[in-house]
């Protein structure tokens, strides 16, 4: 099974878990932002959490611009994980605790993600640490779930530090160990100066970056 197949399967299991437990689709706060994955009866402009479901992209999105900017070859799993689907944030339970996976809400969201990953890669280069890119958060102390770009292994990582605990040999293997967490949607408060808030977890990633850089 590929990373994309494992992610698609988790989306399907995630949706089924909400339908079985709550009788409805997963919901998230949209911050007024439209998305192809919003359900037909959703109201993008509402302040209330709205129902969503995974939708395949018509064209695959890639990270060639980030690779070019950093002059590195990014591990192919990054395109599989981020480039094929639109979806809301995925809350999970795992052998290592609760967490949340980043997913792409709309096209603008993908651009924001590229900027965040580029900033993360630049930080790793500046600190002379192994290159990683993130796919989510885990635990209650804002640790990242990151992928080692050299070999595709999955790790826990604190911003500004080297990864400290390997979670899986691959992103595919990591995804296969997750279980959907059926829980109320989380409202992620963005700093006041931020434009285009993300319905998922970029607020937490931004906070980690600000704590590291003092900005």
UniProtKB/Swiss-Prot annotation:
Q: Where in the cell is it found?
A: Cell inner membrane
Q: How does it sit in the membrane?
A: Peripheral membrane protein
Which keywords accompany this UniProt record?
A: Cell inner membrane, Cell membrane, Membrane
InterPro entries per UniProt: Syd, Syd_sf
Just give the chief location class. Answer: membrane
Q: Which Pfam families match?
A: Syd (PF07348)
Q: Does the entry feature the keyword Cell membrane, yes or no?
A: yes
KW Cell inner membrane (keyword) present: yes
Any one annotated GO CC term:
cytoplasmic side of plasma membrane
Domain of life here? Bacteria
Which family does this protein fall into?
A: Belongs to the Syd family.
Its biological purpose is as follows:
Interacts with the SecY protein in vivo. May bind preferentially to an uncomplexed state of SecY, thus functioning either as a chelating agent for excess SecY in the cell or as a regulatory factor that negatively controls the translocase function.
> What is this protein called in UniProt?
Protein Syd
Q: Could you tell me which species this protein originates from?
A: Shewanella amazonensis (strain ATCC BAA-1098 / SB2B)
Encoding gene, per UniProt annotation: syd
